Amino acid sequence: NTFVASANCGLYCGAKVDFVDIDINTFNISLEKLKKKLHVASKNNSLPKIIVPVDFAGNPYDHEDLKKLSIKYKFRILEDASHAFGTKIGKKLLSPNLGSEIVVFSFHPVKPFTTAEGGVALTNNKKVYEKLKMFRNHGIIKDKNNLKNKNYSSWYFEQKDLGFNYRMNDLQAALGISQLKKLNNFNIKRNKNAKYYLSNLKSKSLTFQFVNKKNFS
């Protein structure tokens, strides 16, 4: 379970993209199948630099085990947490503190939290943070410490790299602030609705996603 955007981010960089099948219980990435791929890749000297796991339907994958694999095989984790804004693993909110280099949340209207469109990337890496700020604004910088031309006026800027226009407007920000106040109630209501569906569909020949009761999403 993934989305084209997760693969596209690698293709934008000229990377080779490969896929790992899901665990039939959690619907998240199968770490057993990933281990097998990593073992083969290690022998072939073709280990991945990045793994992009998904917290499908807000249900977090096994962060602890994937972090151990990342240390063993020296890859970074770029987490697609599009569905998981407000998710807790145990008592900890989903964040880069749990092992990912970057955690990306979507603010699309069908997600738990919305600003009509857009999203946010969280990181504890200062260099990544500065690059993200640059890429969201056409690759432009105004920080005097990083400018080549030190004789500049207040209007002066330099383009360091190719970038995009990912700036959030004021209307979206205002909507997001209002949504933040309701986020916990939104997630509680979704859990209540999920329990209703599960209890009324038990007799059907359906397979449901396993959710660790210690987690909340």
Predicted features, each with a name:
Residues N8-G10, L69, L171:
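Hydrophobic/aromatic ligand-binding patch that stacks against planar heteroaromatic rings
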Residues C9, K91-P96, K111-P112, G163-N165, ...:
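Short secondary-structure boundary/capping segments
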Residues E32-K36, N44, I50-V54, N59-D65, ...:
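PLP-dependent aminotransferase class I/II
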Residues N1-L31, V110:
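Substrate-binding/gating loop at the entrance of the active-site cleft, primarily
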